[in-house]
Amino acid sequence: MSSIVTLTMNPAIDVSIAVDRIASGAKLRCQGGERDPGGGGVNVARVVQRLGADAVAVYPAGGVMGALLQQLVAREGGRSVAVPIAGETREDFTVLEKHS
């Protein structure tokens, strides 16, 4: 049994991209892009596992994004339990302006 179990009620796929500059009304020319598993409990379990302790992340997952979330968590080698849901797992988007 795991010593730490996290429960994430609203997990997400965290999408991060970088742009040279953000200008009102202008298209963003994105460079690179990264997708990571996200949500409070998922992140806590990832850190605990990286520090060498035993943890398992429990979270709902649905739709295409839910399947991707499960793949991303598995890619890191972490233990997890995905609870199937009818809805779609959310995706959030962060833009880093390199110029600032």
Identify the function of each model-found stretch.
Residues 50-100:
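Conserved N-terminal subdomain of the carbohydrate kinase-like
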Residues 1-58, 67:
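Glycine-rich phosphate/adenosyl-contacting loop at the front of the ribokinase-like
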